[in-house]
Structures are given as structure tokens and as C-alpha cells.
């Protein structure tokens, strides 16, 4: 669902505006306390051959499994790093995931990061006459997995027995915003 992907890219990757109960989004980590996206754009406006433009989402305190002060469970971000580089007038992103939900997270993350790259390139192009386009997206994951609760959905997706079953699966996926 492209509407979901656009919402995800804007809300969770580009702007960082999550739900009130969320302690962070990838975007909030990219934008605060240092606006890494803006600084990366400024770096490329000054020096297109800069190979040091890496945005880090993970924080040192993400090492804790629970907040030392509140004792609440803490889940570190799955996406840890977005490394960027301009080669042959194309912006390439290399992304590292600590953990990656192959069924629900992976499709939205890939599509969302493509839209992130398009917005990133657009902002650079608006400030320069480079005429960059998006390049390759490269993904690394330490642990890409499918949760047990998703097994039947994944089986149905890979081996649809009938059109009716496929339509039911599509409705289920749409309900999950996948």
C-alpha cells in the first residue's frame, strides 16, 4: 500500500513524529539532538566527494535492556546506521539493521528508505545544480527473521492455493498495513 509507505517514510524516517506512547522513531533519532539529515545535506552541498556522511540512529544507552532509572524494558532500534555516498551522480545508501522482521518490517523499510533517499536527493538538488538521482540501496542485517505468529501468513503468501485465499491474505496484509 503506497499510502502506508509514504506515511511511514514521512512520519518514521524523515520527520520523526511518532505516536505518543513511542519512545522514539528512526526520524526522531536522526533529527535530535543533532539534525543529522540536515547536516548530511549541508556536507554534500559543500563537498560531493565526502565519504564520511554516516547517520547513526543507535545511541550509547541502547546497550541497556531496561532503562536504569525507570526499570522499563528498552528495545533498541532495529535500523542502526544509514551510510551515504555520491558515486557517478547517484546517491547510494547502505543501511545496517541489527534485527529485521522479514515479513512486516522489511518491505516497509525498503520502500520507506527509497522515499527517504528521494527526499534527501531532492533537498541536495534544491541547494545545488548537481542533478543527483537515487542510486543503490544496500542492506545488511545481523538477524533477519520471520516470527512464528507469521508462519501461516508467509506460507499462504508463498503458496496461494486459490484466488479466494489470496484475496483473504491481501485483506489481512492490508489490515496490518503491510
Protein language model features and the residues they cover:
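Terminal, non-catalytic protein-protein interaction segments that mediate quaternary/complex assembly
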Residues: 1-178
Amino acid at each position: 500500500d503506497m499510502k502506508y509507505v509514504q506515511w511511514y517514510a514521512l512520519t518514521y524516517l524523515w520527520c520523526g513524529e511518532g505516536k505518543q506512547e513511542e519512545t522514539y522513531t528512526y526520524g526522531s533519532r536522526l533529527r535530535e539532538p543533532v539534525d543529522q539529515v540536515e547536516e548530511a545535506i549541508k556536507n554534500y552541498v559543500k563537498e560531493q566527494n565526502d565519504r564520511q556522511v554516516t547517520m547513526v540512529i543507535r545511541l550509547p544507552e541502547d546497550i541497556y535492556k531496561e532503562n536504569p532509572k525507570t526499570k522499563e524494558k528498552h528495545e533498541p532500534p532495529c535500523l542502526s546506521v544509514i551510510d551515504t555516498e555520491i558515486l557517478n551522480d547517484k546517491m547510494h545508501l547502505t543501511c545496517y539493521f541489527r534485527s529485521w522482521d522479514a515479513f512486516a518490517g522489511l518491505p516497509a523499510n525498503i520502500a520507506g528508505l527509497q522515499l527517504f533517499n528521494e527526499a534527501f536527493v531532492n533537498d541536495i538538488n534544491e541547494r545545488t545544480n548537481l542533478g543527483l538521482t537515487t542510486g543503490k540501496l544496500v542492506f545488511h542485517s545481523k538477524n533477519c527473521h520471520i516470527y512464528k505468529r507469521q508462519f501461516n501468513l508467509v506460507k499462504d503468501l508463498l503458496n496461494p492455493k486459490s484466488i479466494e485465499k489470496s484475496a483473504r491474505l491481501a485483506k489481512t496484509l492490508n489490515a496490518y498495513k503491510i
